[in-house]
Amino acid sequence: MTAPWRRLRSLVWEYWAGLLVCAFWIPDSRGMPHVIRIGGIFEYADGPNAQVMNAEEHAFRFSANIINRNRTLLPNTTLTYDIQRIHFHDSFEATKKACDQLALGVVAIFGPSQGSCTNAVQSICNALEVPHIQLRWKHHPLDNKDTFYVNLYPDYASLSHAILDLVQYLKWRSATVVYDDSTGLIRLQELIMAPSRYNIRLKIRQLPVDSDDSRPLLKEMKRGREFRIIFDCSHTMAAQILKQAMAMGMMTEYYHFIFTTLDLYALDLEPYRYSGVNLTGFRILNVDNPHVSAIVEKWSMERLQAAPRAESGLLDGVMMTDAALLYDAVHIVSVCYQRAPQMTVNSLQCHRHKAWRFGGRFMNFIKEAQWEGLTGRIVFNKTSGLRTDFDLDIISLKEDGLEKVGVWSPADGLNITEVAKGRGPNVTDSLTNRSLIVTTVLEEPFVMFRKSDRTLYGNDRFEGYCIDLLKELAHILGFSYEIRLVEDGKYGAQDDKGQWNGMVKELIDHKADLAVAPLTITHVREKAIDFSKPFMTLGVSILYRKPNGTNPSVFSFLNPLSPDIWMYVLLAYLGVSCVLFVIARFSPYEWYDAHPCNPGSEVVENNFTLLNSFWFGMGSLMQQGSELMPKALSTRIIGGIWWFFTLIIISSYTANLAAFLTVERMESPIDSADDLAKQTKIEYGAVKDGATMTFFKKSKISTFEKMWAFMSSKPSALVKNNEEGIQRALTADYALLMESTTIEYVTQRNCNLTQIGGLIDSKGYGIGTPMGSPYRDKITIAILQLQEEDKLHIMKEKWWRGSGCPEEENKEASALGIQKIGGIFIVLAAGLVLSVLVAVGEFVYKLRKTAEREQRSFCSTVADEIRFSLTCQRRVKHKPQPPMMVKTDAVINMHTFNDRRLPGKDSMACSTSLAPVFP
């Protein structure tokens, strides 16, 4: 809501309030008394300041004077007051003073503030039915029978709920609650019960009793790394705590303090504005209202003119919450009395126990009142008289001072403004012009000493990927830094006692602000420190020396073809030979005269016996020949397809054999983590107290558990750093388990090392910050910006690309499998099917001619021929008898041509001739 609108609303409110008051006042102005008396009982302490008027007493007078000057509220009536002072915790004196004021005829009693005195005065007011106005927190029992009081201080249950909502918004996973006295445990019940309902761990501590020295407690919390602390104490104690925390070095950006006092705005926080500390509190004073600002300004002017106070840590002239509550209380009583003008006030005596007859009526007017005062909206619970509906401003310390960052109300809960969401507590400007301590560890190529002919100092001593990353972050966020090497040279691991070492410990102890190194993000480290988003993703792999060449075995000539191919070739050989044998017996064109010079022979023979068929296939496979030549078309198809098949197989075998003979086969004894776990000959390990070691130590996978058992059983398996592990991998039979990025860098520069297998896991490198550091989010945003601009990839290429090892070719020849030459088997099968079809055609055609010539039935001829062909042992058979023949030279020549004599046989001289004889 804008300021002009608030001012207009205030003016309208004052106008209607005046009309409302006049409406009550005008009809019965004659019945209004000329004087209304109220009573105030205030405590004072012994010592030199005993007579100094406190803020509540001043506010009591200030409020009455404002009402008397503003005749709109009580036009014909003067508000007078009676002030009594008592010692702290003197309930007897408080009772006596209350009775004295009741005898004067007061319409209400204000105060006192302390518990025992308040209870004493409240019991008297309850007995005589006179309203008692309370201004401090007070524990009220559940079975509350005291009806004659109202309390303007916000209800403690609602305040505790506001603190819990703020803690949840800040996403605190742990916090420390520090209370001043036992009443603090009652006030913070809602928060203390939070661990049973929310995921938050609370530690409860108490401030020293009867002492303002909180340094021992602060020291203990600092040593315990308790950075999120909720203080339930008075504003006076809060000022002392802040001053002592500054002396203890706890006013830094890593700490976040929440104070439950509603007077945090009144403290002098000038010394802490630029400390970076996260300081959050609550405020009920409605300073956004112009009317309230005007009243507060008048108050400040009067306070500055009063005698100076000895109390330190407060701003001069500031209106405290108690004073604002008392101001509102006096106005509420005055307005309510104005609404009940027919009431009369008599002198009341405590010893008579005679109640004020208008007390109940007046008390109801007060409980039903609704007022917009200095502390905002004032509404009372009609049963308990407590203030349960109010608005709390959430205030936070910035470099410009305290700023309102949100509002909380019982109805709407916590509402953080957009400005606060964008800025947060000291985050936006927290890195600008700040000098940060950066811890790191030497690790190539992330952080290395720069090689130079001259002596280097400071940050110039270092170079590497992380150094370039740090420069880019500093350029984007505008901070300076100092690089320091971690003392023990370790990344950070937790021992059995829960103690950390390495860079993680330096972040926990706040010796460093950032850890910029190849620091792996793990859930164990996340419990101790905060991480940015990863700037590099990687995984664990195996570094091992390259294997030496192996001597070929005696049967290495079988390597060019895979075992499957050898088996299929053998089956093809057997199949083709058998099919050739069967088709040769069925095809009539494979039966011919055993002696071409004797065409009159009654028998024919077939050279493709079972053994000859196998011999023909073997000769073709060996590309040597067998002197067996198929004559029929079907058998020639088989022969041609088989020759084509052997051509492809032999050519492929010869080509791949040359590759196997010329390439030195490189075989590694291990190919994966499973191979490592199954053997004990090769020793393996990781860097001690590193993330890789922690991964195997915490893993629940059986293979990795077995590997960790091996590493933990041998002290020599774990190395101090990567350099030692790399050296062992080169000189001994040792495998180093390390991050893949480092392996990639090492193998680029050492050609004798290689990565074995793939990644065992997946993780990332992040920048570490202390728990609760406000720098983390800004660094994460900067890393994402570098990633989008591809600068992270450019930096990696710069530091990882080596000039040593050339790109390795895949020198290992692979055996030919069915995927590469399987087609030739399909062609062979198709050829066999075709030859069978042709053989069937030949068989049917020839037998039909024979049946006609012999004047037999076709079926009987086929049956006889099949019966003979199935007799596999016989290689000769009787020739079908033609008709009577006569010897003529023409017939002899024709017969010789049709019988297709073997090559060389045609030149043989024959002395006989046949001539057909026709009957």
From Swiss-Prot:
Q: List all topological domains (Extracellular).
A: 32-563, 658-820
Q: Does the keyword Phosphoprotein apply?
A: yes
| Coiled-coil zones | none
Where is this protein chiefly located? membrane
**Annotated L-glutamate binding sites:** P518, T520, R525, A691, T692, E739
**One GO MF term:** adenylate cyclase inhibiting G protein-coupled glutamate receptor activity
The compartments listed are: Cell membrane; Postsynaptic cell membrane
Q: Which named protein is this?
A: Glutamate receptor ionotropic, kainate 3
